[in-house]
Structures are given as C-alpha cells and as structure tokens.
C-alpha cells in the first residue's frame, strides 16, 4: 500500500518503524470514541499491538473492527500521520507474544527501565491485535 519509491511514503514507513508510541482509536458500543497510546510493531504490511485482555479497546474491537492509528506530531502540525485500518484479535495464538525478537529489540530497554521482563509483559499483555491498513494519510 505504501510506495517506498515516493518520498512521502518512505517517510511514513520510516516513522512507523522507529516511533515507539502510536494512538489506537476505536469506537465504543454506544458510538463514543476511545483513544489509547500503545506500543506497536510495523512490518511493512500490518501492525502488531499487544494489550491486556480486559481493556476498553479490546471490548471495542470485539464489536467494531474499524480503527484509526495516529502518530504524534513532531513538527508543529506538519508531520501528522494517520492510518485507517481493520483490527483482528488474534485468539489463542501462543506464537505471537511480547517476547517476539522484534518487539524485544524495539522495547526491551523500556521494559527493563520499567523494572519488568519481556516474559512478564507477554503474560500481562497477552491479547495480540493485528491491524491491516486500508488508508494512509500523511499531513
């Protein structure tokens, strides 16, 4: 979906690979929006996010899979990146956890600074979410 030969798309891809927080926006059953800052992995085609299983965002995604992801602005409004997508809750997939090498590489120092270990994070944040982009917006 991103054309890395285009400067703007390459910039979006670079930010998605290097930024450590992204805002996951979902919709509650009553139609009200919900926003949560989350850690994430971007592999070039989909996002992988881990959550505690009984959170508002998981309840939202069980009834509506439409999401909007947003990267924080870094240049006073000129570098906002939004991604519309469809979320899938990965149920019972023991192979996907916060102990993934790519996740530990990206967040290992932060996990350690929190006084935790990847295995503990994987146990606490056991619900994996895969988000497949449907539209990218770089402003």
Residue ranges of each PLM-predicted region?
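Alpha-helix boundary recognition
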Residues: 16-17, 62-63, 122
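Charged, gly/pro-rich active-site loop segments
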Residues: 1-6, 80-139
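A short beta-turn/loop motif at secondary-structure boundaries
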Residues: 30-32, 75-77, 119-123
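Short beta-strand segments
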Residues: 19-53, 59-61, 67-71, 81-82
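Extreme N-terminal tail/first-helix region
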Residues: 1-21, 77, 113
């Amino acid at each position: 979906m991103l054309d890395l030969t285009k400067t703007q798309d390459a910039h979006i891809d670079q930010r998605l690979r290097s930024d450590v927080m992204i805002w996951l926006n979902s919709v509650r059953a009553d139609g009200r929006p919900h926003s949560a800052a989350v850690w994430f992995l971007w592999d070039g085609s989909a996002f992988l996010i881990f959550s505690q299983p009984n959170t508002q965002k998981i309840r939202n995604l069980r009834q509506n899979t439409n999401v909007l992801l947003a990267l924080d602005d870094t240049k006073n409004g000129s570098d906002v990146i939004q991604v519309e997508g469809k979320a899938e809750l990965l149920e019972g997939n023991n192979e996907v956890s916060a102990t993934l090498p790519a996740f530990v590489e990206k967040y290992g120092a932060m996990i350690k600074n929190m006084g935790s270990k990847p295995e503990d994070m994987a146990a606490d944040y056991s619900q994996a979410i895969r988000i497949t982009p449907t539209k990218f917006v770089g402003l």
